Amino acid sequence: MIASSLKIMLWDKEIGRLSWDARRGVSFFEYNPAFLGGRLDPFPLVASVKSPASRRPIMGDRETKLYRKLPPFLADSLPDAWGNQVFECWRIQNGIRNQEITPLEILSFIGKRGMGALEFIPESSGIRKSEKLNMKLLTDLAQRIFLERENVRLLPDESLTMQSLIAVGTSAGGRQPKAIIAINPETREIRSGQIAGHKGFDYCILKFVDCVLHWY
């Protein structure tokens, strides 16, 4: 399903909607009127709630390639090289044509897993809080995606591992494969770090480099 409109959430508050104008090939953002009356001002330099312009649609940037036709203050939530590789693998696995993909589809895929405070609804379903991660399988699959890129083909038994990799690895920035995880130092149990509230767990970024795990 191709996303044409997304709720933009900040700390459980809907700050506005991001929509895609298919005819013009550009996105536009509209503040939630109820949010404009509050005290939060998430984008004070470029789209302040105090500005009269915030009462009108804010168009995406069609000139700067980096922003991918999104308003600059939302484009920063797009994944970097590694997250894009995972997304591309997911797209191929689900039979979605590349020409059907808009920036909104990518943000919808990120959902609640972004590195910043913004969340994009609808979200891509991830692994549940109770599920543990198999680091050996994650590492092997991450290396294959990184090395084979668009030529990678998932085996039937790798589908669940791919879901886990999506849940932990799509928002971490940079070129190299990474994952955001939560680890219990006593039991050595590892879970997704994209879900808050794991008691007794430390959160860190895991970097896959030549099948060696680096912890930060």
Feature-to-residue mapping (PLM):
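Phosphate/dinucleotide-binding and metal-coordinating scaffold of catalytic cores
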Residues: 1-216
